UniProtKB/Swiss-Prot annotation:
Keyword Cytoplasm: yes
A GO CC term attached to the entry: cytosol
EC number: 6.1.1.6
PANTHER family hit by this protein: LYSINE--TRNA LIGASE, CHLOROPLASTIC_MITOCHONDRIAL, LYSYL-TRNA SYNTHETASE
Name of the protein in question: Lysine--tRNA ligase
Reactions catalysed: tRNA(Lys) + L-lysine + ATP = L-lysyl-tRNA(Lys) + AMP + diphosphate
Keyword Aminoacyl-tRNA synthetase: yes
GO molecular function (one): magnesium ion binding
Complex formation: Homodimer.
Family (UniProt): Belongs to the class-II aminoacyl-tRNA synthetase family.
Keyword line: Aminoacyl-tRNA synthetase, ATP-binding, Cytoplasm, Ligase, Magnesium, Metal-binding, Nucleotide-binding, Protein biosynthesis
Amino acid sequence: MTEQTQDENKLIAERRAKLEHIRTNCPANGHPNNFDRKHKAADIQAEFGHNTKEELEGMGIERSIAGRVMAKRGPFLVIQDVSGRIQAYAGKDVQKDLKEKFLGLDIGDIIGVTGQLHLSGKGDLYVNMEEYQLLTKALRPLPEKFHGLTDQETRYRQRYVDLIVNEDSREAFIMRSKVVSAIRNFMVKKEFMEVETPMMHSIPGGASARPFETHHNALDIAMYLRIAPELYLKRLVVGGFERVFEINRNFRNEGLSPRHNPEFTMMEFYMAYADFNDLMDLTEEMLSSIATELCGSPQLPYGEHTVDFGGPYARLSMLDAIKKYNPDNATIQSMTYEEVKDVEFMRDLAKSLGMTVEKFWTCGQLLEEIFGETAETQLMQPTFITGYPADISPLARRNDDNHFITDRFEFFIGGREVANGFSELNDAEDQDSRFKAQVDAKDAGDDEAMFYDADYITALEHGLPPTAGQGIGIDRLVMLFTNTHTIRDVILFPAMRPQAN
């Protein structure tokens, strides 16, 4: 046991002893639930922060606050609520009473205070403690500071502690809530209907990913947590709902990284009588308006860069992007789609770039992997990458001029993918063939290949109108709006490896 742990255990024991005293001498077993908090710290600061000491004394303003004790400075307590901080003043008689009733207050305790509002000699607003209650006794002490790797782990494992002591974390999650609300409002104004589709699927589909598997006892069948809502949302478009969207969780049984969490939030939407160009236009409008609404400007700081959401956004094909960011590679500079279709040529090119090549990779997979290896991280400004090969886009419509590629894009900012969209494949027979190719790929060892979904083929046979659809990764988007560089900083309770003990 470390010295720090011994000290913490001693403090916890002291606080437990105080709680026993409180239970004996205070009503409600030391946990009252009848305090009427009427005011918030930030509202008080905004309304009276400009008044002088004399003005406040003449006004006789009474305020009722509640929150957590974050600091003790002589007779002053710093009280924190959801909106901010304000001080409370405990005179000598109050301090004596606090000692008798509660054996004194500790940092972390939650209290309610009612009294006159005053201004201290240092110019800080405070509420005089005329009426007060200890609402919750904190048994564990708060950490003094968060720094270093160990404390990073604590931030994620004990997010409740992080939110108490770390204002930046609180602000990040407040911004997350605002981003989600702004997206929802934007979609509703564009006449999209919000829907909810199943979270458990009998056949996982809508993306290339490993699913989480479970078992439904009553039906005695295997079920999968959804990897994407796409196929259900398109069934709704078949049914006549021409504009639908869903903001919800997806689950993918894959690794952890600064960009990946096994459960994550997506906003996925579909619009009939539109194509992938319409999606790109809508995405520009959405992100530009949301950035301006929430941040006052379409230009946001991100690390050493400034990301400009104002538009227009760059648009280039995957092949052109590879050429752009490999200017000194003669083979890449002269590469054509005919060569991209040659799997041996692509395998040799990937190996020449120092890449490890899986035996089941197709031409399209090789092109995408080369793009990811050499170009993706260069895309700091908002950029639409188009020209995705059909063999890695099993749900997207083929391009009319070049059947090797599809009318699909992925949207990149800050060197990472944030969204994926395309003109939907509504040819039931073509979709049937592509599903079968995915089954063959799975048999060849690609465990992220899709399953065959016969009911979805049946839905397409009823007729899907020309449709475009897109998914936006909410977590990665929020990372940009909060200038954070790991997905764990924008997910309240991220997945963590089990602790040794």
